[in-house]
Amino acid sequence: MANTTSAKKATRKIARRSAVNKARRSRIRSFVRKVEEAIASGDQALAAAALKAAQPELMRAATKGVMHSNTASRKVSRLAQRVKSLSA
């Protein structure tokens, strides 16, 4: 248990940031799931549209520190590769 005032404040602050980060991570998963569902259905146009919506969300998460920038880039790259393979 935190004893000092600053430690108590830090605990409150961490709880708030954790809630924000959890919400953002959940939102990212939803966007990625939509892309993966579109890929599974084989609809190239729908998958491309879903990817276009998911990409800024992933990069925003990297900017906000929810995930590492390399992780976000890797996820975007792999999704784009799978969407592109639908047209071939």
UniProtKB/Swiss-Prot annotation:
Q: Which Pfam families match?
A: Ribosomal_S20p (PF01649)
**Region Disordered, annotated ranges:** 1-23, 65-88
Q: In the record, what terms sit under GO molecular function? A: small ribosomal subunit rRNA binding; structural constituent of ribosome
Q: Name one GO biological process term.
A: translation
One GO term describing the cellular component: small ribosomal subunit
Q: Which UniProt keywords apply?
A: Ribonucleoprotein, Ribosomal protein, RNA-binding, rRNA-binding
Top-level taxonomic group: Bacteria
Q: Which InterPro entries is this protein grouped with? A: Ribosomal_bS20, Ribosomal_bS20_sf
Alphabetical list of HAMAP family matching this protein: Ribosomal_bS20 (MF_00500)
Task: Tell me the protein family, please.
Answer: Belongs to the bacterial ribosomal protein bS20 family.
What does this protein do, in the record's words?
Binds directly to 16S ribosomal RNA.
Output this protein's name. Small ribosomal subunit protein bS20
Q: To which species is this protein native? A: Rhizobium meliloti (strain 1021)
Q: Which gene encodes it?
A: rpsT
